[in-house]
């Protein structure tokens, strides 16, 4: 028998040696033992055959086979069986599968439950439906099986040890404990077996766990003598909780008597209730050393501790309701500042409630604390978000004061109607953003432009082109700063020059209106180029999204195809 429960690489090599790949397609393989219900159909008998069970598809005969290969002695195929049509292949246990042969039932006991589950799925999907492997006309044998398999089944000789229901523990030691299972079933009381079966436990499970049932009966034999003891123990714990519940309600009377210590004798009216908590709490009360000997003093101590503890628990509503009577006592005991040790003994007095109450209050405060802590940060973040928009307008304002003439130009640029003449000088700064080499060209062009600045008539048409330029200017702030140095001085001189004659002379000297128009035309294509350049920038994101979606769909298709291929590729079984 192979030492490992799964098929190893050596086992695979042995399997391929005796089941050639040229005429067979291996679907699944696992290490098993072969059992048969023969000659007694009510008992499983181990045949002595074990090895690698292979589910293979014969490509020539177009049918599926069970083939048991001896991987220990390398003796080849020691048993085989053809799968007939509509074969009833059952999974009796996670590790044991059975099916019907010509004369008897056969069963496989798997060494590994994972291999058993995979093998079972393969048999149902493809072994019992070979048409799923290939579509041509299939040749199936009848439910009786072929004649050549009958000798194989008849040659199976049951060994001396015959386990009725093979279990996983029987896999390593054949027939060691299995013969005792029927005796254990017979030793159990039939009424007990019937009651267990009514509770949903099958007879096979009872047989497997017969040792445990017997041991459990022996352990519980001290309390009940009858075999119906197993159902009684579960009923005992069910009766104990109700005793604890009244013990919880019992503390209600103790808080009422604390004002008068003579009322301590009142609890003995219900002795079982105080006795139960005392019996449950001696270990815990051992931590509180004072009230050990007298039970009455324990009750009074519990009442006093309850009174001392009631002040802290008021936050939970349930404790308020329960602690209404002791609140008055708590006020009288409020003079006692050090109740930390009593609450511990008090926690022992009432085990379930105080710790639960204590654990309940702490969570709410941390929840409220983080909630309050989280609320201010979003406010501050929102403020921070609102603050960034303010700096951008401040940035042009700060850059403007750096150059006083530029500040005037910006002021003139804000109102469109009174200051259109100041817009033409903005055209030269537009040239540098288009390309850095144009900066030196803008420097010589600056002298003629200042006199043309005050001219308003030709520029109204250029107004729409000017507004988009300012946003482009802030993109390269360092470049425009050195270039407009010369025009800045000229712009500062513009308000000093008065008289239309000088302006006309300067216009003529600069080349006249035609030159200005040509410059306007040259400025407009730059704006158009910026506008046209923007759409292609926006287009790629849309294409990228579509490409990403398409790639995701393709990946999903490939994954699905791979999963299908994994199911179809049965030659490489693992």
From Swiss-Prot:
Positions of the UniProt region annotated as Disordered: 144-186, 221-494, 517-574
Question: Which SUPFAM superfamilies does the record associate with it?
Answer: PH domain-like (SSF50729)
Q: How does it assemble?
A: Interacts with vrp1.
Give the UniProt subcellular location, in the record's own words. Cytoplasm, Cytoskeleton
CDD domains, per database record: EVH1_WASP-like
- Native source species: Schizosaccharomyces pombe (strain 972 / ATCC 24843) (Fission yeast)
Point out residues bearing the modification Phosphoserine: 386
PROSITE patterns according to UniProt: WH1, WH2
Its BP terms in the Gene Ontology are:
actin cortical patch assembly; actin filament branching; Arp2/3 complex-mediated actin nucleation; endocytosis; establishment or maintenance of cell polarity; mitotic actomyosin contractile ring assembly; mitotic cytokinesis
Protein name stated in the entry: Actin-binding protein wsp1
- Does the UniProt entry include the keyword rRNA-binding? no
Q: Where is the composition biased (Acidic residues)?
A: 563-574
Q: Name one Pfam family in it.
A: WH1
Q: What taxonomic classification does the UniProt entry list for its organism?
A: Eukaryota, Fungi, Dikarya, Ascomycota, Taphrinomycotina
